[in-house]
Amino acid sequence: MPHHYILTLFGLLPVATNISTWWNFGSMLLTCLALQVLTGFFLAVHYTANINLAFSSIVHITRDVPYGWMMQNLHAIGASMFFICIYIHIARGLYYGSYLNKETWMSGITLLITLMATAFFGYVLPWGQMSFWAATVITNLLTAVPYLGTSLTTWLWGGFAINDPTLTRFFALHFILPFAIISLSSLHIILLHEEGSSNPLGTNPDIDKIPFHPYHTHKDLLLLTLMILLLLIIVSFSPDIFHDPDNFSKANPLVTPQHIKPELYFLFAYGILRSIPNKLGGALALVMSIMILFTIPFTHTAHLRPMTFRPLSQLMFWALISTFVTITWAATKPVEPPFIIISQVTSTLYFTFFLSIPILGWVENKMMNIS
């Protein structure tokens, strides 16, 4: 029997017997993070943060560095996998009421914001056409901030336009933020295991717990193996499936792409931003699309923790998932009818879900006669 604190923490950690496959995504995210840090380090060794050499250095990595193509594709596609796992992880938290463990939820959403910032800075680094214009459009939103906007943008750019200082500081931020992510992840795990994870029934599992190892480690390994297998299949056979064709051209400030869009995992937020025809309004909606997740623990009024036995909340939850997918799809299309109205309707529905949580909880309590 291990007596060391760390071994005890991970090996003998008591976990509910009835947690399902949806609880596997935490360990998958940890694997994704390790993969990103590892591949990112080897890419940083060969990368040059200069606007004249950045694009060429990526070409050099993929062509000349041994297994450079694999590192580059694992890093890029691994980021997409990372965010897919994150969104499923958050959806599970919403469905099963994991957000009632407030400290864990708050640290998790802070982690999400840090991850989004890191991924955005990373997307700019290849200095391709779409990287440059996505950076221009998104950083330009800072000018919408009253009084301070222009100063903030100039400070972030390191000049009056996106140039060499911008790329240098984005590379520095992309390199340093993963250390903040590792720290926040550790905090997230510590806070989670202080109270213990939730379970599909939303009941107190203290009377029925088993050690994390070997039971849940073996269960986690199945999805983990499938995820790595899928990642390697995509890297080997369709490495450009998530890439934008415009990004295979070097950044040209004089030529605007026909349709500017960020990476796959940011499309829902970009769709919400684009649906509002006002710069400040769009920027606020973009920020609120993530920040609204902080409010959920305080708007929960239902007496039952998970949505397992709450049909109205289930209906709204699956409507949210459909809305999320539809916004993502609409954001890939040009800004023209009918995609404008689709984005506006789905963006409204997205925020409606979060506003309806307290009302639905109250109605369900009345329906089930829970006082």
From Swiss-Prot:
Keywords: Electron transport, Heme, Iron, Membrane, Metal-binding, Mitochondrion, Mitochondrion inner membrane, Respiratory chain, Transmembrane, Transmembrane helix, Transport, Ubiquinone. Its cofactor is heme b. CDD domains: cytochrome_b_C (cd00290), Cytochrome_b_N (cd00284). GO terms for cellular component: mitochondrial inner membrane; respiratory chain complex III. Heme b b562 binds at residues 75, 174. GO terms for biological process: mitochondrial electron transport, ubiquinol to cytochrome c. It is found in: Mitochondrion inner membrane. Binds 2 heme b groups non-covalently. Heme b b566 binds at residues 89, 188. GO terms for molecular function: metal ion binding; ubiquinol-cytochrome-c reductase activity. The keyword Electron transport applies. A ubiquinone binds at residue 193. The chain crosses the membrane at residues 25-45, 69-90, 105-125, 170-190, 218-238, 280-300, 312-332, 339-358. It is a multi-pass membrane protein. InterPro entries: Cyt_b/b6_C, Cyt_b/b6_C_sf, Cyt_b/b6_N, Cytb/b6-like_sf, Cytochrome_b, Cytochrome_b_C_euk/bac, Cytochrome_b_N_euk/bac, Di-haem_cyt_TM. It comes from the Eukaryota. Belongs to the cytochrome b family. Component of the ubiquinol-cytochrome c reductase complex (complex III or cytochrome b-c1 complex) that is part of the mitochondrial respiratory chain. The b-c1 complex mediates electron transfer from ubiquinol to cytochrome c. Contributes to the generation of a proton gradient across the mitochondrial membrane that is then used for ATP synthesis. The cytochrome bc1 complex contains 3 respiratory subunits (MT-CYB, CYC1 and UQCRFS1), 2 core proteins (UQCRC1 and UQCRC2) and probably 6 low-molecular weight proteins. Heme 1 (or BL or b562) is low-potential and absorbs at about 562 nm, and heme 2 (or BH or b566) is high-potential and absorbs at about 566 nm. This is Cytochrome b.
